[in-house]
Amino acid sequence: MPQTIVLDFETFYSQSYGLKKYTTEHYIRDEQFQVIGFAYKVDDGETHWVTGTDRQITEALQGLDIPNAYLICHNMAFDGAILAWRYGIKPKYYLDTLSMARPVTGLTVGGSLAALAKKYLLDEKGTEVVNALGLRREDFPADQLARYGEYCKHDVDLTYGLYHVFKQWNPPKELYIQDLMIRMFTDPVLKLDKNVLVDHLFNVQDKKAKLMERIDATVGRDALMSNPKFAVVLQKLGVEPPMKISLRTNKEAYAFGKTDQEFKALADHHDPRVQAVVAARLGIKSTLEETRTESFIGIAERGSLPILLNYWGAHTGRASGGDKMNLQNLPRGGALRRSITVPDNHSLVAVDSAQIEARVVAWWAGQEDLVTDFRNNVDIYSSFASIVYGRTIDRKKNPNDKVEGFVGKTCILGLGYGMGPDKFKATLKIGMGGISVDMPLDEAQNTVKLYRAKYDKIAQIWKDAQAALAQMSKGFECELGVGIALRCTPEGVHLPNGTMVRYPNLRKNADGFEYDGRYGPVKIYGGKMVENIVQALARIVVFDQMAKIDIELRKCDNPEADRRYKVALTVHDEVVSVVPTTVASWCLNFMLEVMKVPPKWCSNLPVSCEGDVGNNYADAK
């Protein structure tokens, strides 16, 4: 293994300028940014503190052999971006102890250096940073700057210790994926089209203003912005406010979200006044499009588009959006997707793994008839819809079968985890892609029964998972699954790549089973456990394919010649690369080839994919 260098920067911050108010990207690129100093450790040697003028700090960093070293930091997105953007230095390999910790501690102590050090090193993180508020490098008294240096050195020592704690739980390929994701942020290649964004912002604000004009005189903005006040507005109109149980607090809360089925249904209320206030509420509360567009414009003015993904951001190992910018749910074909573009003479190549979760659940449960249909490229959605409606459905060739095809798709993608009739009915009502189906409850019940009868092995694995939970909660081990038998222990489910889906302190309660989450107990049952495992397995498949693609592209990457070959982004089950336009067709074919081959541990899993090439993210979808 090459030389390791542990590094930690201390930087200027104030009441108005810091990571609590700024994104990481904005903070580092802002004109107020200043490095106070940094600490470093080479291999297991002595830890050093460096401060001084900008030139002295730059020379000290350049004196370290970082380009040929494995760089270790805690929260690499911060320190790695400072190195890359401010000093033009990139290491041979990024090792981020925050990313390394998440698969182990994400549900318990979290990822802060202080919490991890206390639990795993039995050591305390210092607090000297608090005294640095508002002080630029030239403002520090000598003694305070020296104390700050000791504080920084201690952070480096803690990071070094945590690296040795967590490396045992991070297989080499997962470390590569962490490095890949860090480079999406520290070495960005995507750009933003400011003109597209400015036009879109005008349209969004104009639409919101017109919505407000409709109800300003009768309701007022304050009532729309406040959940309790808006509840009173509905009650005065004779409507009982819909409620739900908050996943975060586990307490009852108003169901006024854009995807809350009962609230969305009020937009079709027979009283026009109710329609108006609900539409206006959705408009004024749905400021995500507006604020995200404004954020994109700011990034466009500062430079390229860094993609910060939280490695293992979800319980099942999937990534989540970071830096207050989630690209996981951009509207298809919308202006925000269209604004994401590439450097001159380059193209964007996007390949999406097809129905990966539905394929994995069928394979893992041993549902051979469904696996065979996937392998033979049968239109599964139309096939199952034909059973539901008692006639031949062909959603691809018959435009009149569009709704029925949507129902079939919802069944295949939604019923594999034990979804009941009520939720199935609500899911159809919420709709997707402009289609919404108001299925009677008795029809929803029959459809769920049809699915469970036809795909009985999938229904059986929910029961097997429930039995596994009982064994695990008693401290026993067992195996679960047909396509691959996974080892289940009291700690969780062991995955084929050496990671785990963890269930900390799994136990039986009066209602079933629960485990410790970040915000309190989390309910778990057979169908949910199957969903967790299938998502984790699907994630391994796609991320392993992404790593294979990236390994090949890195061989050709040449930033100095402005010829980039790079995996730039991953969204759900999609991999997005940027390559010179002259090789875009080759890259598409290569990515399609890679993503049609499963890993060795699931060599008989039928995987498929589709992709395209474009000048922007919308065109490549």
Where are these regions (language model features)?
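Function-dense linear segments that define catalytic or interfacial modules
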Residues: 308-395
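Conserved "right-hand" nucleotidyltransferase catalytic core of DNA-directed polymerases
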Residues: 1-10, 15-17, 33, 39, ...
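Active-site palm subdomain of RNA-directed nucleic acid polymerases
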Residues: 166-178, 541-575
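Short active-site loop/helix that positions an aromatic residue
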Residues: 77-89, 102-104, 231-238, 354-368, ...
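Active-site-proximal helix-loop-helix substrate-binding element of RNase H-like nuclease domains
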Residues: 33-40, 44-59, 63-168, 178-180, ...
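Conserved catalytic palm subdomain of right-hand nucleotidyl-transferase polymerases, strongest
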Residues: 7, 73-74, 95-98, 342-356, ...
